[in-house]
């Protein structure tokens, strides 16, 4: 039996223009009102996630910065498995390299991040990976489709899901995860049921146990409708 739903935000409970899908929000509220814990998981910052949790109506249990941080409830201890120092070092290397080519890297929410470094998608992530590799830095370059993130290897939404499940007294097999991007793959694989919405890339679709017919927030609603009667029973 599934007891908790973990969902990505951008591209999963939004529309293609990153506007929140109101049907997805109503679905989340229905789950919360039924006593099912809903965890929001994103590459975004803790402060962004806190505001979203308040407005949507969840209890503040989050996975942020692509697994670099996670927390049980608004009053819980913020866990930070990511190592931001090495990510900052990697960003400096990239910034110096691309500045030499006349390209400026625009940081995203740097003052609000605890574990990773995020910046605009105006460079080729494969080129960034090659530069990081040439400098021997232990940093993962992650392209979420919304930003490029520099992250500690071995840290992902999937590892955060496993650790969060332990704090909640659950097994990862008792969690359902929904996502749309390559940064959701580990999360879908770690959960008992992993669902990809139709707009996901091929690698993410292949990692999922089930794929919705609809994309974006409508696909999220479809997924919950499919699994709710059978798996979220009490």
UniProtKB/Swiss-Prot annotation:
Catalytic activity entry: 2-phosphoglycolate + H2O = glycolate + phosphate
Source domain of life: Archaea
Single annotated GO MF: magnesium ion binding
Positions of Mg(2+) binding: 8, 10, 180, 184
Cofactor(s) in the UniProt record: Mg(2+)
Amino-acid positions noted as binding substrate in the UniProt annotation, renumbered to this chain: 157
One CC-aspect GO term: cytosol
Catalytic residues of the enzyme: 8 (nucleophile)
UniProt record similarity statement: Belongs to the archaeal SPP-like hydrolase family.
Function: Catalyzes the dephosphorylation of 2-phosphoglycolate.
UniProt-recorded name of the protein: Phosphoglycolate phosphatase
Natural source organism: Methanoculleus marisnigri (strain ATCC 35101 / DSM 1498 / JR1)
Upper lineage: Archaea, Methanobacteriati, Methanobacteriota, Stenosarchaea group, Methanomicrobia
